[in-house]
Design a protein with these regions (language model features):
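His/Asp/Glu-rich mid-to-C-terminal helical/loop segments that flank catalytic regions of hydrolases
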Residues: 255-306
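Solvent-exposed loop/turn segments at secondary-structure junctions
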Residues: 45-46, 74, 81-85, 96-99, ...
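A non-catalytic alpha/beta surface segment that caps or lines the substrate-entry region
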Residues: 37, 41-95
Length: 306
């Protein structure tokens, strides 16, 4: 923990060991599941998906926004156009903390057209929503400013998050001190991956260490993964913003060593329903969803100085 605190201090992401160990709440996984059930209902009512340009995506945005508005967040919907259709980013600011030091977390809210996308990425989106609502319920007054983003059209090439970052001025980018991404956290044959800081902007190592510490606090071993430009952190990294994230695995098969470490089935994909119609609410490993969501809270509460 001393090393973690030192890394955070050096990179400007200051946090005390006591805060990192004590501040973060245990997020009730049943609440996260309730959000996933609503996203499933939305998909069922809108042609079986929540994809860009389809009514299911806008309905998903409206659901998340209504929850955040009722909790006291300052929200706005940012629109963009891709493939001839309107896309939507949802930005939510907790109206406290130093606005010159912004800690941001996000994940994409759209699915592919083939299915409802409950793991990819209902899981990360729902976890972020419940952490945001927990901040509000606890009436947290952080030292730093907390902002969330739910991105559109990720499945078409990270379109929404790239549009958001490109819309920021240099000054607006400079105040974002960290961006943490959560894309797939409930894979049915789960892994516990932390984004590698290798090749990422200065300050990313502190986020990597913090996320690893969050899992270690729950007794969960991790592996680093190089996600490259595969998810919404990429636009932030290109802007020089420190990034990190967690991931429970997609189409790649779990190795025997990973199955021994984490349980589950060797030589089977982490998520056999990745980008398929079967990515439904029945495609979620609740233990993985619970652990990853708690680590979202651990990281954010630590970074904002809750």
């Amino acid at each position: 923990m001393k090393l973690l605190a030192a890394l955070l201090l050096v990179t400007g992401l200051t946090i005390s060991p006591a805060q990192a160990a004590l501040a973060a709440p245990d997020i009730p996984v049943a609440n996260v599941q309730a959000h996933l059930n609503e996203l499933q209902r939305i998909a069922n009512a809108n042609g079986g998906n929540r994809a860009h340009g389809r009514p299911g995506h806008k309905a998903s945005v409206d659901y998340v926004k209504a929850k955040l508005d009722a909790a006291g967040y300052q929200t706005r919907i940012q629109t963009f156009t891709n493939s001839g259709a309107t896309g939507y980013n949802l930005i939510a600011d907790w109206p406290f903390g130093d606005a010159s030091q912004v800690i941001m977390a996000g994940g994409h809210l759209d699915s592919v057209t083939r299915g409802p996308g409950i793991n990819d990425n209902g899981s990360g989106s729902a976890g972020l929503l419940e952490v945001a609502l927990t901040v509000a319920r606890q009436n947290v007054r952080p030292a730093k400013h907390l902002r969330f983003g739910w991105w559109g059209a990720e499945e078409l090439g990270l379109v929404g998050s790239t549009f958001y970052v490109n819309s920021l001025t240099s000054a607006q980018k400079s105040v974002i001190k960290a961006y943490v991404n959560f894309d797939m956290t409930g894979s049915p044959n789960p892994g516990y991956f932390v984004y590698s800081s290798s090749g990422q902007p200065s300050g990313s190592l502190a986020i990597e260490d913090l996320l690893e510490a969050g899992f270690a606090a729950k007794g969960v071993p991790t592996e680093l993964t190089s996600v490259g430009g595969r998810s919404d952190h990429a636009a932030f990294a290109r802007a020089g913003i420190p990034t990190g994230g967690t991931f429970s695995g997609a189409e790649v098969r779990k190795t025997a060593a990973q199955a021994q470490k984490w349980g589950g089935q060797a030589n089977v994909a982490f998520d056999r329903c990745y980008h398929q119609a079967c990515d439904t609410s029945g495609n979620i490993n609740v233990t993985s969803l619970d652990r990853h969501t708690d680590v979202i809270a651990y990281a954010l509460y630590s970074l904002i100085g809750a």
